[in-house]
Amino acid sequence: MNRYFLVVASLLLSITAVCQNFDEYFSDATLRLDYVFAGNRTSQAIYLDGLSTSPRWYGRRVRLDALPLAGNGQITVTDSISGRVVYRHSFSTLFQEWLSTEESASVARSFENVFLVPMPKQTVKISVELFDYHSHVMASMQHYVNPSDVLIRRIDKSAHPHLVLQQPADTAHCINIAFVAEGYTACQMGKFLDDSRRAMEAIFDHEPFTSLRDKFRIVAVESASDVDGTSEPSAGKWLDTVLGSHFDTFYSTRYLTTLRLKRLHDALACVPYEHIIVLVNTSKYGGGGIYNSYDLSYTDGEYFEPVVVHEFGHSFGGLADEYEYSNGDPMYFADTEPWEPNITTKCDFSVKWPNLVDSGEAALIEGGGYLEKGVWRGCPDCRMRTNKVKDFCPVCRQALSRLIHFYIDP
């Protein structure tokens, strides 16, 4: 059965089932799960790297056992006594993206990954699964977490100061986003806060974020670096910044990311966050966005605003790139419907945007997901395709709206 269909089915079941009580299984605290994903193109493995906890839980408190999107990986938390699934989370990773590169055919590498789940009141089983491009499980592992384990590190104070940029009236039913400074020195924090406000306004200038602005809490974390800027390996420039970001990810000149996920979440300790936007103090064009991991963007250039919004479409919305390359590496195949809501292989288009085709707001236009053939998008242009267009297309707006309501609706 198609993994995308399974997610839709689980969501429908969660809506009709008896509402799960957050307080029955969880404390108002966060359990941080550190993993190492490692391997090569033919063999992959998952390793537990560490556990820590901090006060307060800033993620969703509704639809805990459902997923809005399948992602390229999933975490499932199961109560060890009743066997009930009490929390699920989906994500994507740079590790899985790296597996599509030529290097993965001859070299094994490891990647840090960090995930947050609510702190259980009693022992739970945690299952982690990674999927390949055909939605088959390629790696999995299970482990148990006892909340009284003395080796779970307790963190009770922030590593850096933070400023609230926007506070919703209802903080119990809101989405928490944190801007994080990368490559800003202590004396440049005024610039970081200005850049954060610019990025925030750029996001809220796009529907459906404009109409749902009061559902978001935004903070800015003043994580100072000793030097300004970021590393540019192809130019022989390496800097020791607070988050270790760099261009040339997977030898792609403009691909700006950080592989130091533990550093990133250390910087966010005890801050109200669920989604992360890293602002990099550089004028060189670039960025990256990984679903339920982070949005990372350059700041000093003509396209800062559209880039940070585009990458947020990836990291928050799970949206796919809608552009194509003449020699793109295939990540989407005719026998598998992509989990991303804004592209289709027509394997199961019924779960995508047929309603918008019927209304005339969208169509089926071939080209997207880095491929010229075999993948279709809904509109000629979109924020997920180019920097020039002003808005998300109707397909992306619909997907983003559904996702936001999944998080916030009672």
Name the predicted role of every residue range.
Residues 4-15:
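Sec-dependent N-terminal signal peptides
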Residues 17-19:
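Boundary at the C-terminal end of the N-terminal hydrophobic targeting segment
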Residues 25-150:
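Beta-strand-enriched, solvent-exposed domains that form extended recognition/catalytic surfaces
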Residues 150-207, 220-232, 238, 249:
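Fold-level signature of zinc-dependent metallopeptidase catalytic domains
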Residues 189-192, 287-311:
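Short pre-active-site segment immediately N-terminal to the catalytic Zn-binding motif
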Residues 200, 305-322:
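Active-site recognition of the HExxH zinc-binding catalytic motif
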Residues 215-291:
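Active-site-proximal segments of metallohydrolase catalytic domains
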